[in-house]
């Protein structure tokens, strides 16, 4: 049996999956990432995925959101300073197309990942991003196949910054190789379908031996109107696009695994929330997101445990290794 973990994108709403996974991890004998054979994540989910694959505990990743979240989104002030900062961000967005500088995000990620490379991952990894110049997908992968000969040398920080470079929020990320990349959420905000396709098509794992845990960053629930104002339509179009992509990706995973008609293979965690209650950059709701994640884990733990957490996964040995890597 092969186990896959997939984590959606969603900005600061990543606190929800981080909290959910941390609560699940509290009863385990090893870090949660060690219980999966393949981990995929996009944007904020990509940051979580990389951390888990590198051996970090979900608890430590959650603490990163709690301690650094407000600073990353420049909401660590109040009063006149906060008001001025909000005006500055609006002006910055108009001038440069990016609401927030990336320096604080980079500093936070370097603090947990340092100089680690993709090849240092202890679990197979798949992190979607987008190459703006050629308008093509760019997926960071561990060396879990003979033909994957490049990414394992790349900095984990580069992969994290690339997948999280959400247009309008952060500027395009330029990697150490001078490659410009943006948020993988443009095409794979929910990467579960592509993770399952990787498992079946590249790793050649039997589809009927897969178990998949797919975790969202909440699902906005609201009424759909027959028409919207021009201003509202801009944000709604993005919402509709993301929802469509997510359902398409999940549908692909269902087809490949035979779930639910042939067997149970996919467990989708997608807690509903009132539309507009949790925006992608509102750090004032971190505690509420953590609350929701814990409550969801409390309900799901007895259901998920026998399928995903009876014992750690088989150790991952990459095909191509970094110098000094003695895994065999």
Where are these regions (language model features)?
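C-terminal helical/tail subdomains of lipid-metabolizing enzymes
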Residues: 171-178, 186-188, 207-210, 217-219, ...
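Surface-exposed beta-strand-to-loop junctions
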Residues: 1-3, 42-44, 82-92, 136-138, ...
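Active-site gating loop/helix substructures
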Residues: 120-201
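Short helix-terminating capping/connector loops at secondary-structure junctions
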Residues: 31-35, 118-122, 204-209, 260-263
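Surface cap/lid and interfacial helix-loop subdomains adjacent to catalytic sites
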Residues: 98-124, 204, 225-256
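Conserved small-residue
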Residues: 10, 45, 109, 127, ...
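Patatin-like phospholipase
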Residues: 2-6, 12-108, 144, 149, ...
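Extended hydrophobic secondary-structure segments that form protein cores and membrane-embedded regions
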Residues: 4-7, 37-43, 125-130, 181, ...
């Amino acid at each position: 049996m092969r186990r896959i973990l997939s984590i959606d994108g969603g900005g600061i709403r990543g606190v929800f999956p981080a909290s959910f996974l941390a609560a699940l991890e509290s009863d385990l004998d090893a870090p949660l990432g060690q219980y999966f054979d393949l981990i995929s994540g996009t944007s904020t989910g990509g940051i979580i995925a990389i951390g888990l694959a590198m051996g970090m505990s979900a608890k430590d990743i959650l603490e990163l959101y709690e301690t650094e979240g407000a600073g990353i989104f420049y909401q660590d002030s109040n009063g006149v300073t906060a008001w001025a900062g909000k005006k500055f961000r609006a002006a910055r967005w108009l001038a440069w197309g990016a609401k927030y500088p990336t320096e604080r995000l980079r500093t936070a990620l370097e603090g947990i990942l340092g100089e680690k490379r993709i090849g240092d991952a202890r679990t197979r990894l798949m992190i979607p991003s987008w190459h703006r110049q050629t308008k093509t997908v760019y997926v960071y992968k561990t060396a879990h196949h003979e033909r994957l000969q490049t990414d394992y040398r790349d900095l984990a920080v580069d992969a994290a910054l690339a997948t999280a470079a959400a247009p309008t929020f952060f500027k395009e990320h330029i990697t150490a190789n001078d490659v410009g990349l943006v948020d993988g959420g443009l095409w794979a905000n929910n990467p579960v379908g592509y993770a399952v396709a990787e498992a079946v098509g590249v790793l050649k794992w039997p589809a009927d031996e897969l178990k998949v845990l797919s975790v969202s960053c909440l699902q906005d629930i609201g009424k759909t109107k027959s028409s919207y104002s021009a201003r509202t339509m801009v944000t709604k179009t993005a919402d509709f696009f993301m929802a469509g992509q997510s359902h398409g990706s999940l549908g692909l995973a269902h087809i490949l695994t035979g779930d639910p008609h042939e067997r149970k293979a996919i467990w989708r965690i997608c807690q509903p929330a009132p539309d507009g209650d949790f925006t992608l950059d509102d750090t004032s709701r971190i505690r509420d997101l953590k609350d929701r994640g814990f409550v969801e884990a409390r309900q799901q733990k007895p259901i998920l445990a026998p399928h995903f957490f009876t014992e750690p996964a088989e150790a991952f040995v990459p095909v191509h290794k970094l110098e000094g890597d003695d895994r065999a």
